[in-house]
């Protein structure tokens, strides 16, 4: 199995196949998700001291904070081959 890394900004990467969702941090449920992950010691802060612009959810229930826009990370996931079925992702966006 080939491991593909996804650049989430500022020299940080995650394994692309482990990513479940990339969401915006603006809504109240996402703020709650972030706080719950912090309490459970499953929060990874990859913002490098910058403002959180995306929240990445992994299959191991870890929450990763990124300083890069969610749309940018999603585009990188598509162009770097991290998603096996592009049509499935496009359907999820609609």
Swiss-Prot record:
Domain of life here?
Bacteria
One Pfam entry name: RemA-like
What InterPro entries is this protein classified in? Answer: RemA-like
| HAMAP family referenced in this protein's UniProt entry, alphabetically | RemA
> Member of which family?
Belongs to the RemA family.
Name-wise, this protein is Putative regulatory protein Sfum_3631
Question: Species name for this entry?
Answer: Syntrophobacter fumaroxidans (strain DSM 10017 / MPOB)
């Amino acid at each position: 199995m080939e491991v593909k890394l996804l650049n989430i900004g500022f020299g940080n990467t995650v394994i692309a196949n482990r990513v479940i969702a990339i969401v915006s941090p603006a809504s109240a449920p996402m703020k709650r998700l972030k706080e719950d992950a912090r309490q459970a010691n499953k929060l990874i802060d990859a913002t490098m001291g910058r403002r959180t612009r995306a929240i990445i959810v992994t299959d191991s229930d870890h929450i990763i904070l990124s300083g890069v826009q969610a749309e940018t990370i999603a585009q990188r996931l598509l162009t770097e081959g991290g998603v096996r079925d592009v049509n499935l992702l496009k359907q999820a966006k609609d």
